[in-house]
Swiss-Prot record:
Function in brief: Accessory subunit of the mitochondrial membrane respiratory chain NADH dehydrogenase (Complex I), that is believed not to be involved in catalysis. Complex I functions in the transfer of electrons from NADH to the respiratory chain. The immediate electron acceptor for the enzyme is believed to be ubiquinone.
PANTHER family to which the protein is assigned, alphabetical: NADH DEHYDROGENASE [UBIQUINONE] IRON-SULFUR PROTEIN 5 (PTHR15224:SF1)
Database matches in Pfam families: Ndufs5
Record's bilayer topology term: Peripheral membrane protein
Entry protein name: NADH dehydrogenase [ubiquinone] iron-sulfur protein 5
Motif (Cx9C motif 1): 33-43
Classification lineage: Eukaryota, Metazoa, Chordata, Craniata, Vertebrata
Keyword annotations: Disulfide bond, Electron transport, Membrane, Mitochondrion, Mitochondrion inner membrane, Respiratory chain, Transport
Domain notes: Contains two C-X9-C motifs that are predicted to form a helix-coil-helix structure, permitting the formation of intramolecular disulfide bonds.
CC annotations in GO: mitochondrial inner membrane; mitochondrial intermembrane space; mitochondrion; respiratory chain complex I
Subunit structure: Mammalian complex I is composed of 45 different subunits. This is a component of the iron-sulfur (IP) fragment of the enzyme.
Principal location listed in the UniProt entry: mitochondrion
Gene: NDUFS5
CHCH domain boundaries: 30-74
Disulfide bond sites: C33-C66, C43-C56
Organism per entry: Gorilla gorilla gorilla
Amino acid sequence: MPFLDIQKRFGLNIDRWLTIQSAEQPYKMAGRCHAFEKEWIECAHGIGYTRAEKECKIEYDDFVECLLRQKTMRRAGTIRKQRDKLIKEGKYTPPPHHIGKGEPRP
């Protein structure tokens, strides 16, 4: 027990907010991946770690993708490479405001 337990004194539970997004949040705003985490926890609850690894893999993968956005970033990189390739070949010209030559806005 810490000498000054500030979290308890102010009625805060920051540890729970940081570990489980499904927990009650300070401003009643659900986390970005709240729905995916909730599905995963509901699936894995009560069946044990070994079974949960196999049976809840889809829910867990969705949750991890929401947190890390690896597939999304990989897809954005592929799209950017394709765009650069088309620009180099002369088959695509980006709009002026995408290359910094558009009209200045207030």
